[in-house]
Amino acid sequence: MRDQLWPGEADRLWHRRTEQGFSTIPRTLPLVMTLIDDLKGKGKDTSRVYLDLWCRQMDDSFVEVTDEDAFAYSCGYSTPGRNVRTWRERIDILRDMGFIGVRPNGSRRYGYILLYHPHKVVAEVQKSGKVSLEWWGAFAKRATEVGAVLEPPSAA
């Protein structure tokens, strides 16, 4: 179908099997990011930090924080002096929500990050009653479309 609608465009497209620099991410990630934004405080653009972490992991859910300035800039935090502080605040929010684990590396407080299975985290958040029925419906539909198996939701 694609080639019928865009003939001759194949050489302009990203092909994960022939390119370097790709990452495997859950197909439900946009909805998980929406939930993160729904649950965090106003003005705390946390979901793009979560996306950046997923793009940095190498299919092992593990990220070594090698340069906090570069991580912050990648997430859109470019103001010197505030960029790293803002990034760290968002990391703390993701940790407190249960989406990631954080461990130090020597004297560096944010040395390593572990990305937990987002569907398992979502199930825990849903059990706490913080997930809207609208979001859960959209998430369950998308998860079913991509073949993901979800824990049954708590009775509301």
Q: Which residues are covered by each model-predicted region?
A:
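Intrinsic-disorder-associated interaction segments
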Residues: T18-T28, P80, V125-S132
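Short, amphipathic alpha-helical interaction segments positioned at domain boundaries
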Residues: P118-A156
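Short, cationic/aromatic linear interface patches
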Residues: R12-L13, R103-P104, G111-E124
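Short recognition helix of helix-turn-helix/winged-helix DNA-binding domains
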Residues: M1-D69
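Winged helix-turn-helix DNA-binding recognition segment
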Residues: R56-I113
